[in-house]
UniProtKB/Swiss-Prot annotation:
The keyword Chaperone does not apply. It is found in: Cell inner membrane. Keywords: Antiport, Cell inner membrane, Cell membrane, Ion transport, Membrane, Sodium, Sodium transport, Transmembrane, Transmembrane helix, Transport. Na(+)/H(+) antiporter that extrudes sodium in exchange for external protons. This is Na(+)/H(+) antiporter NhaB. It catalyses: 2 Na(+)(in) + 3 H(+)(out) = 2 Na(+)(out) + 3 H(+)(in). The keyword Hydrolase does not apply. It comes from the Bacteria. GO terms for cellular component: plasma membrane.
Length: 514
């Protein structure tokens, strides 16, 4: 017997999502207009909380759908306007271009990356050393590349590793569905679970590595560029001014990496199963035997394009997204990828997230229009100069863990600069606050995927369900890093920032804002 019209509509609404999730979203959509009529400020914070809820439930339903419905309603009831959303999207066009083109560009370098990381994985047997290598590599790369790019690289490598073993375990060859474990023998499933734990830990080490490296340079994170521009700092100035905080944090972050692996805390410590190592070794041996001269040329071309990518980003020869587009053009033209459908596959990973980020900008527009952060900013600027550093750091960290880093960093640096121009704070205090704002925006935000775009990208990627990386598990595995990075950063802002900056200024290493 065919189901009723109402039941059919309910099943279609958000598809396979649980009924309780669908009901919760309907409740949000119904109550928001009434709360907005009663108190717009409370309604604004409620909308932010609801959006965070959709991100937390990313594995129940991709956040673009529920988050998009909330954003559309916010515009309709007047919490913000379509024109303001367009302004926010236009202001963040660089980030959208990055997602569309840079992530797709990395897709065409996967052969080289898989080759390099397979050699790395097979040559380093110690899990602690391997984890440290992944963390250091991610930190170094993210100091020059955007963190999203680095995470995209590691995701592509992890999916490659997982796919190789899953095909063998399921005995289904190229037609294998990596999400389907029904054809896998129980013995293989045990090994597969261990392999998933191994990949989860590597992904988290690499993800935190991007935060450790990204905070150090003005090109490491999008908000760093905005902060550096407001302060009038160039690449060297930015690195030196951040170093009293970022260098100790980097050292302690790497020590944390080794400690959690050694002690097997927080879900870390899982080693690469020997059966998987054997499969990867066989795959590597077969790949080398089958590799033709044409294949070798492709690897060489991809390596040259990789050099171009790092050089262009480090020297800022063009916007990040446009450099990514050049990578797509060069990689496809020089490796013979000419079919439209083959090129289109490169965009399947990044475009859903690009759409999600666009929805997020509409939530940012609500935050601005409803002045949700205004009371916090006023409170901080009323404190003493020494307390301001700590408060800016902590409030940046708190807000960055639930909101967009670029937005939080932009709001605070603009407020700090306005305070300096109005005579509320001195130039020296502004320069110290700039460091507190940048480190506060970048370091504590590793606490949740909401705070780090790279973490959110990982959570919503095709890899997350394969290795069973949920929102809660990601927060739990990030916890030791969150504690160490936040506390060491806070201690450095409190005790080493001012004296170290004073010493570097007297030594003539630092230029001041003119």
């Amino acid at each position: 017997m065919e189901i009723s019209w109402g039941r059919a509509m309910w099943r279609n609404f958000l598809g396979q999502s649980p009924d309780w999730y669908k009901l919760a979203l309907l409740v949000f959509l119904i109550v928001n207009p009434f709360i907005f009529l009663a108190n717009p400020f409370i309604a604004g914070w409620l909308l932010v909380a609801e959006f965070i809820f959709t991100l937390a439930m990313a594995l129940k339903c991709y956040p673009l759908l529920p988050g998009g419905l909330l954003a559309i309603e916010a515009v309709i009831i007047g919490m913000t306007s379509a024109a303001h959303v367009r302004e926010e999207v236009a202001a963040n066009l660089e980030v959208l271009l990055l997602l569309m083109f840079m992530v797709a560009g990395i897709y065409f370098m996967k052969q080289l990356l898989l080759f390099i990381f397979t050699r790395l994985l097979l040559s380093i047997r110690s899990k602690m050393v391997l984890s440290l290598a992944f963390c250091v590599a991610a930190a170094f790369l993210s100091a020059f590349l955007d963190a999203l790019t680095v995470v995209a690289v590691v995701i592509s490598v992890a999916v490659g590793f997982y796919g190789i073993y899953h095909r063998v375990a399921s005995s289904r060859g190229e037609e294998n569905d990596m999400l389907d474990d029904s054809h896998i023998d129980p013995h293989y499933k045990t090994v597969l679970e261990q392999f998933r734990g191994f990949l989860r830990s590597l992904m988290m080490h690499a993800g935190v590595g991007t935060a450790l490296g990204g905070v150090m340079t003005m090109v490491g994170e999008p908000q760093n560029l905005i902060i550096a521009k407001a302060a009038g700092w160039h690449f060297g100035d930015f690195f030196l001014r951040m170093s009293p905080v970022t260098v100790p944090v980097l050292v302690c972050g790497l020590l944390t990496c080794m400690l959690v692996e050694k002690m097997r805390w927080f879900g870390y410590g899982e080693t690469l199963p020997e059966k998987v190592r054997d499969v990867l070794q066989q795959f590597d041996d077969q790949s080398r035997k089958k590799r033709t001269r044409q294949d070798k040329i492709k690897l060489i071309v991809q390596a040259v394009i990789g050099v171009w990518l790092v050089t262009a980003l480090a020297l800022h020869l063009a916007e990040v997204g446009l450099i990514g587009l050049s990578v797509i053009i060069l990689a496809t033209a020089l490796t013979g990828v000419t079919d439209e459908h083959a090129i289109g596959k490169a965009f399947t990973e990044s475009l859903p997230f690009t759409a999600l980020l666009t929805v997020f900008f509409s939530i940012v527009a609500v935050i601005i229009d409803q002045h949700l952060f205004a009371p916090i900013i006023q409170f901080v600027l009323q404190a003493s100069e020494h307390a301001q550093l700590t408060l800016f750091y902590l409030f940046n960290g708190l807000l960055s863990s639930i909101s967009d880093n670029v937005f939080v960093g932009t709001i605070y640096i603009n407020e700090a600069k306005a305070a300096m121009e109005n005579g509320a704070i001195s130039l020296k205090q502004f320069e110290l606050l700039t460091v507190a704002i940048n480190t506060g925006t970048n370091l504590p935000s590793v606490a949740t995927p909401n705070g780090q775009a790279a973490f959110l990208f990982l959570l919503t990627s095709a890899l997350a369900p394969l290795i069973r990386l949920s929102y809660g598990r990601m927060v739990w595995m990030a916890l030791p890093y969150t504690i160490v990075l936040t506390l060491i950063g806070l201690l450095c802002v409190e005790f080493t920032l001012a004296p170290a900056t004073e010493w570097m200024t007297q030594a003539g290493w630092l230029a001041t804002l003119s």
